[in-house]
Amino acid sequence: MEISTIECVIESLIFSYGDPLPLDKICEILELDKKTARSILKNMMDSYNNSNRGIIIREINEKYQMCSKPEYFDYVSKLYQIRQKQALSQAAYEVLAIIAYNQPITRAKIEQIRGVNSDSAVTRLTERNLIKEAGKLDVPGRPRLYETTDEFLRCFGFKSIRDLPLLDIDDLNELNLQELVEEFDEEGNK
C-alpha cells in the first residue's frame, strides 16, 4: 500500500474513532510495525500543524486524536452550548500536582505531603477523570493507588507523563505547591 493511501486510512480511522486511537490499534488494522506507523503519524502531525487547516492531530500517550486548533476555540465554542465546569480548587490543583509527580501514590501519602485531609480533592479529580485508581498497594489494609489519566495529559497539553516540567528539588515536601499549581495552570492554558 502506498504511503498516501496509508495516511488516508489513518486519517479516516482517527476521525471515525473520535476518542484518542491507540497506536497498537492503528498498527493492527494496517498491519504496520510501530516504528513505521509512528513515522507516518509524525509526518501527518507535522503536515496538519504546519498547514492552513482548522484541525490538528494530537498524540496523547501513544494514542492519536483529531482536534480543532486552539486558536479557533472561540468559533467552535459557539457551535455548542458549553456548560462551564466549576474551576478546580487550590487544594485540587495541589493534589493533582502531587499525584502527577509521585504516581502511583496512596491517599495517605498525599495527605502526608499536604498535611491535611484530601478526600474531597481526590473525589473531585476522579469525577473529572483527571486521576484514576491504579490498583492497590501490597501492604496491610491494601490502600488504593492513584495516577493521572489520559484526560489529564490532554487537558494540560502533554504527550506523556514524561513531558511534565522537571522539578529542581530533592524532596517534594520542600516544594512550594503554589508555584507548582501556577506552573500546571500555565501548561494547561497554552
Swiss-Prot record:
Keywords: Cell cycle, Cell division, Chromosome partition, Cytoplasm. GO terms for cellular component: cytoplasm. SUPFAM superfamilies: Winged helix' DNA-binding domain. It is found in: Cytoplasm. One of its GO terms (biological process) is cell division. It comes from the Bacteria. Homodimer. Homodimerization may be required to stabilize the binding of ScpA to the Smc head domains. Component of a cohesin-like complex composed of ScpA, ScpB and the Smc homodimer, in which ScpA and ScpB bind to the head domain of Smc. The presence of the three proteins is required for the association of the complex with DNA. Participates in chromosomal partition during cell division. May act via the formation of a condensin-like complex containing Smc and ScpA that pull DNA away from mid-cell into both cell halves. PANTHER family: SEGREGATION AND CONDENSATION PROTEIN B. Belongs to the ScpB family. This is Segregation and condensation protein B. It comes from Ruminiclostridium cellulolyticum (strain ATCC 35319 / DSM 5812 / JCM 6584 / H10).
